[in-house]
Amino acid sequence: MDSKMIECKNVVYKYEDSNENKFIIAVDDVSFSIDKGEFVVILGRNGSGKSTMAKHMNALLVPTEGKVYVDKMDTLDEENTWNIRNKAGMVFQNPDNQIVATIVEEDVAFGPENLGVEPKEIRTRVENSLKRVKMFEYKKHAPHLLSGGQKQRVAIAGVLAMMPECIVFDEPTAMLDPSGRKEVINTIKELNDEYGITIVLITHYMEEAVEADRVIVMDTGKLVMEGNPREIFSNVKAMKRIGLDVPQVTELAYELKKEGININSDILTIDEMVNELCRLK
């Protein structure tokens, strides 16, 4: 059985800059694969190509050169587009752009209705999806009265109701306050842990990447680093060189080690830092 959900092979994506009459290379010869059930974070600065790469994962964009396969389906083949978008859902940065109805449960029902799902099955999917994101009690509410974090969870429920095997999140917390960010990240982690949904999270918040199985770092359209969170974030120099931060506790461990203190440099959480400092007593 093939366990790959997404496979990118030598992907190049160019677009024309009409002002300067030249082509811009947004993604430059990128190759990686994502297994079914995996939680992968793609990090990068603004303009690194990470969001462009995300849009290739459910055929919103297709490569200029190279190939992208979603569950073995070639995104360049237009006959696959419908099935690819059923297989890989997408949640965007601004939930207001993804919410289409005036009542929460009607919004969540919108996707399956357009798939031609039976009304009884739609009701079941809507209830289950809202329960998964802990928004069931708000099903009769108007989305515009909800907080940013709650709106984003409704948008996630709308994608879940279409029963995808993979969800690509394109900077879903960029417009949220810290509590809203925490709500959404906890929801994403739960979807992966409890329901086995493949997660691809595009972000520039380092703390959001700590829980991932794997981290991919992009810069100027290229894949520059790949590994588990400890491998990536303990390489503080390389991250700083490409203009990215690391979690604060990781940077603290790095600075302490530079000062000659015998401390592990691959610390990712506050609890790990506390344990390490207690060990040094």
Curated annotation (Swiss-Prot):
It is found in: Cell membrane. InterPro entries: AAA+_ATPase (IPR003593), ABC_transporter-like_ATP-bd (IPR003439), ABC_transporter-like_CS (IPR017871), ABC_transpr_CbiO/EcfA_su (IPR015856), ECF_ABC_transporter_ATP-bd (IPR050095), EcfA_1 (IPR030947), P-loop_NTPase (IPR027417). It is a peripheral membrane protein. ATP binds at G44, R45, N46, G47, S48, G49, K50, S51. Keywords: ATP-binding, Cell membrane, Membrane, Nucleotide-binding, Translocase, Transport. Residues 6-245 form the ABC transporter domain. One of its GO terms (molecular function) is ATP hydrolysis activity. Its EC number is 7.-.-.-. One of its GO terms (cellular component) is ATP-binding cassette (ABC) transporter complex. CDD domains: ABC_cobalt_CbiO_domain1 (cd03225). It is an enzyme of class 7 (translocase). It comes from the Bacteria. Pfam families: ABC_tran. SUPFAM superfamilies: P-loop containing nucleoside triphosphate hydrolases (SSF52540). Forms a stable energy-coupling factor (ECF) transporter complex composed of 2 membrane-embedded substrate-binding proteins (S component), 2 ATP-binding proteins (A component) and 2 transmembrane proteins (T component). ATP-binding (A) component of a common energy-coupling factor (ECF) ABC-transporter complex. Unlike classic ABC transporters this ECF transporter provides the energy necessary to transport a number of different substrates. Belongs to the ABC transporter superfamily. Energy-coupling factor EcfA family. This is Energy-coupling factor transporter ATP-binding protein EcfA1.
